[in-house]
């Protein structure tokens, strides 16, 4: 009865591992006991090296350090390495003038593979779902095994070794940072300072999924329609950000005695950021040996990029008062402006052609454990009661949200309007 319902001969012809005829050319390729997970995994070693030098005297202190780390991944051809260099110093130019300086550089390189649940591009996932009956490599006519990777099997599952050996998943990060803080103490109660910080970050990423040994991937548009098939894929991205920060401040402690302590801080902060990014994606290069974006099919290639700038500034004030070191009062006020705020922002203070947000707060505290009636309570070391009220805000908006009225969109994949 079953033979009437299903044609077994057709099934054998389509699934070679069901055919035990050793004279067939496909027998060796479909009668194996391959441990795919073992083939793509390996033992991994991690190395860490570091050098640190410290020195100085009563006038100047310095510290210099270099560190290097290299860690191999458990999947073949994956690894991570990082180099970091840092120098910082503390210099007393005079009894009143002090200068702090810090400079650092770090770079890292991560060679990785897709490790998610992806039946086309994840070597780990493919090694778990691919049948062990198939050979990872093709066989020559004389029956010897070649070095050429086997293609997609009859079940439509690709070769995970192709992703390990031929794909590219590279991420490179760079960071350079400088901090400087000169300060001058007029007295032991009055100090002024200016902190400057400059940070440069860059990220480069490269991705390539080969065609050899892997299934084609359908490309779907916004309507869910397949418009092409991807044999191989290239992705490149670059992002670069520069950040500058200034903070000019005054610290004043007009009252310091055993009963009263009053510390006042006021200043001005300025932040400036610039971000540049580029992204490109393409499909179907003429060969897996040509894995650059320019070699992809032009109709299946897309690029994008952006340049964004944003700034913010703040005038701030902070007052801390202590009475007998157990009754505490704190008052904070900040006036913030941002390039992301519209000039006519509702509820904002309009001044100097800018919209300012006012953010005050006040808090009071009582260190109960410092009271006389608490000294005999041994099981309690510290008890403090706090009450506070404040207003807060942020500039978590798109950089040009207050200026954009019209945006261009892609039409039918061929025009912008």
Model-found features: residue ranges?
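Surface-exposed loop/interface segments of Gram-negative outer-membrane beta-barrel transport/assembly proteins
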Residues: 1-32, 73-78, 84, 88-177, ...
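Predominantly transmembrane beta-strands of Gram-negative outer membrane beta-barrel pores used
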Residues: 40, 48-70, 74, 86-92, ...
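Short Gly/Pro-enriched turn/cap motifs at secondary-structure boundaries
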Residues: 40-44, 307-308
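Outer-membrane beta-barrel architecture
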Residues: 50-54, 65, 88, 179-181, ...
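Residue-level signature of outer-membrane beta-barrel architecture
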Residues: 55-57, 91, 103, 182-184, ...
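Short, contiguous hydrophobic alpha-helices characteristic of membrane insertion segments
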Residues: 62, 315-334
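Transmembrane beta-strand segments that form the barrel wall of outer-membrane beta-barrel proteins
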Residues: 66-72, 329-338
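Short turn/helix-capping motifs enriched in Asx and small/polar residues
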Residues: 347-360
């Amino acid at each position: 009865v079953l033979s009437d319902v299903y044609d077994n001969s057709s099934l054998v012809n389509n699934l070679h591992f069901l055919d035990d005829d050793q004279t067939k050319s496909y027998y060796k390729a479909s009668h194996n006991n391959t441990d795919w997970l073992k083939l793509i995994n390996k033992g991994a070693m991690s190395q860490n090296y570091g050098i640190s030098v410290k020195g100085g005297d009563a006038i100047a202190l310095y510290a210099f350090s270099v560190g290097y780390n290299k860690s191999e991944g458990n999947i073949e051809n994956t690894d991570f390495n990082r180099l970091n260099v840092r120098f910082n110093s503390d210099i007393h130019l005079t009894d009143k003038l002090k200068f702090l300086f810090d400079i650092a550089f770090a770079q890292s390189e991560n060679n990785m593979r897709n490790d998610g649940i992806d039946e086309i591009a994840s070597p780990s996932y493919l090694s778990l779902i691919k049948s062990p009956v198939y050979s990872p490599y093709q066989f020559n006519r004389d029956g010897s095994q070649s070095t050429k990777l086997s293609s997609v099997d009859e079940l439509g599952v690709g070769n995970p070794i192709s992703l390990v050996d031929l794909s590219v998943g590279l991420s490179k990060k760079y960071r350079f940072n400088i901090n400087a803080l000169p300060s001058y103490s007029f007295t032991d109660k009055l100090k002024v300072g200016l902190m400057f910080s400059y940070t440069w970050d860059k990220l480069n990423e490269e991705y390539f999924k080969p065609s050899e040994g892997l299934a084609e991937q359908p490309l779907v548009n916004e309507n869910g329609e397949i418009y092409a098939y991807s044999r191989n894929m290239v992705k490149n991205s670059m992002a670069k950000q520069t950040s500058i920060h200034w903070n000019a401040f005054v610290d004043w402690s007009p009252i310091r005695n055993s009963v009263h302590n009053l510390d006042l801080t006021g200043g001005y902060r300025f932040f400036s950021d610039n971000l540049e990014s580029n992204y490109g994606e393409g499909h179907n290069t003429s060969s897996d040996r040509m894995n650059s974006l320019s070699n992809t099919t032009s109709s299946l290639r897309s690029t994008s990029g952006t340049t964004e700038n944003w700034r913010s500034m703040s005038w701030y004030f902070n007052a801390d008062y202590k009475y007998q070191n157990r009754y505490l009062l704190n008052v904070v006020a900040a006036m913030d402006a941002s390039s992301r705020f519209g000039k006519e922002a509702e509820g904002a203070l309009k001044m100097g052609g800018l919209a300012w947000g006012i953010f005050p707060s006040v808090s009071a505290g009582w260190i109960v454990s410092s009271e006389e009636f608490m000294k005999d309570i041994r099981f309690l070391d510290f008890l403090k009661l706090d009450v506070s009220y404040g207003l807060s805000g942020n500039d978590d908006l798109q950089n040009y949200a207050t200026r954009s009225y019209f945006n261009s969109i892609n039409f039918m994949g061929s025009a912008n309007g």
